[in-house]
Amino acid sequence: MSPVVATVIFALAAYLIGSISFAVVVSRAMGLADPRTYGSGNPGATNVLRSGNKKAAILTLLGDAAKGGLAVWLAQWLAPRFGVDETGIALVVIAVFLGHLFPVFHRFEGGKGVATAAGILLALNVWLGLATLATWLIIAVFFRYSSLAALVSAVFAPFFYVLMNGFDWIAGAVALMAVLLIARHRANIAKLLAGKESRIGEKKKAA
């Protein structure tokens, strides 16, 4: 198998893995309402938590993070065997993230990508993932806005990557992932600017 064909297969497999929406799968398995039908309508752990089922929210968070990490880890493990270079890994990063945002198995109605991005970053470099998670935690603790923490972390993640690994195709993939994540938070940005965004621990505010 040529490296080009292997890269295409890796990317396609990553997209399909990313397309598994754990918010939807876990909710169905536990007899809960589809998370796309209540709260923010976002199929993610934060919205699943609004169902009142903490276990479902935790499973969603872990599942979404694990799928991102698994896709990238498998690609990195198999890459040397098929001659796939860093460009291929970069494509896998984007593919699994796009799978989460636009899942083929769930009518292309995906989440915002925070947990999946965390899993991807941890798989690329544990210290990169931990630095980004620490950034999220600091912002979340001081400002108590989950969305703001995600946005700030997304901005810093590409810089952390470059500091640790230098400029390469994967750095570009991390930057693109950050842009996509920020774009998925457009409504949250508008609410933050209007002072209507819910803080961590508060009930969702009216739009």
Swiss-Prot record:
<dbReference type="InterPro" id="IPR003811">
    <property type="entry name" value="G3P_acylTferase_PlsY"/>
</dbReference>
<comment type="pathway">
    <text>Lipid metabolism; phospholipid metabolism.</text>
</comment>
<dbReference type="Pfam" id="PF02660">
    <property type="entry name" value="G3P_acyltransf"/>
</dbReference>
<comment type="function">
    <text>Catalyzes the transfer of an acyl group from acyl-phosphate (acyl-PO(4)) to glycerol-3-phosphate (G3P) to form lysophosphatidic acid (LPA). This enzyme utilizes acyl-phosphate as fatty acyl donor, but not acyl-CoA or acyl-ACP.</text>
</comment>
<protein>
    <recommendedName>
        <fullName>Glycerol-3-phosphate acyltransferase</fullName>
        <ecNumber>2.3.1.275</ecNumber>
    </recommendedName>
</protein>
<dbReference type="GO" id="GO:0043772">
    <property type="term" value="F:acyl-phosphate glycerol-3-phosphate acyltransferase activity"/>
</dbReference>
<feature type="transmembrane region" description="Helical">
    <location>
        <begin position="58"/>
        <end position="78"/>
    </location>
</feature>
<comment type="similarity">
    <text>Belongs to the PlsY family.</text>
</comment>
<dbReference type="GO" id="GO:0008654">
    <property type="term" value="P:phospholipid biosynthetic process"/>
</dbReference>
<keyword id="KW-0808">Transferase</keyword>
<keyword id="KW-0444">Lipid biosynthesis</keyword>
<feature type="transmembrane region" description="Helical">
    <location>
        <begin position="4"/>
        <end position="24"/>
    </location>
</feature>
<feature type="transmembrane region" description="Helical">
    <location>
        <begin position="162"/>
        <end position="182"/>
    </location>
</feature>
<keyword id="KW-1003">Cell membrane</keyword>
<feature type="transmembrane region" description="Helical">
    <location>
        <begin position="86"/>
        <end position="106"/>
    </location>
</feature>
<dbReference type="GO" id="GO:0005886">
    <property type="term" value="C:plasma membrane"/>
</dbReference>
<keyword id="KW-0443">Lipid metabolism</keyword>
<keyword id="KW-0472">Membrane</keyword>
<keyword id="KW-1208">Phospholipid metabolism</keyword>
<keyword id="KW-1133">Transmembrane helix</keyword>
<keyword id="KW-0997">Cell inner membrane</keyword>
<feature type="transmembrane region" description="Helical">
    <location>
        <begin position="120"/>
        <end position="140"/>
    </location>
</feature>
<keyword id="KW-0812">Transmembrane</keyword>
<comment type="subunit">
    <text>Probably interacts with PlsX.</text>
</comment>
<keyword id="KW-0594">Phospholipid biosynthesis</keyword>
